[in-house]
Amino acid sequence: DRKFMLKDFDKFMSQLKETNQTLDFFCDFDKISQNVEDIKLSLCMLNSLIGASDLRKSVETIWNRDKNAFSVMDILVAVRTRDKKKILDSVGNCVPLESMFTSVDSVMTFLTETGLGEVLQSQKVKNLVDYVFGIETGLDTNARKNRSGHVMENTVANILTNAGISFRQEVYSREWS
């Protein structure tokens, strides 16, 4: 009966809280700190680019010492390596972003075309470790959305379970087409 269903739905809706967020919900600082710690040595090497009067020479110095330091540069533009991002190169070819870290020339192209070289040379950033901590905090907002969704899923699941109502945790749209 439709009237009975509406009454139950209204009761269900009245039991939901305005929010499901506690203070520990906003940022997972343990995860953020670990992500930064994992690349800290490379970031410290890249710190020498900050304020460099001859950016290319500074890049060459790092390259000759440890070219792997550049493999973390994607995070400086808020991209994670595991996302396997692709970009269009200067001639329109679709290439992996990580290919920008395979030579001094490609690193220079990355620094120039992203604007990051100017940011570093003009010292708009003072320390890449702190800068990446901020980026990681920003990237954690997507994880926050996922955390919020999971908390709400569990809240609704508990309400339905306690009411003895059978349900499926997830239903995919392809099942309805």
Predicted regions and their residues:
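N-terminal, charge-rich interaction modules
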Residues: T141-T155
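Nuclease-adjacent, charged terminal/linker segments that flank catalytic cores
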Residues: D1-K126, L139
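A short acidic/basic microdomain associated with nuclease active sites
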Residues: T161-S177
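Terminal, low-complexity, charged helical segments
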Residues: D130-F133, V151-N154, R174
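Generic structural motif recognizing short loop/turn segments at the entrances and edges of beta-strands
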Residues: V125-V129, T161-A163
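A short, surface-exposed helix-loop junction/capping segment
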Residues: V129-R144
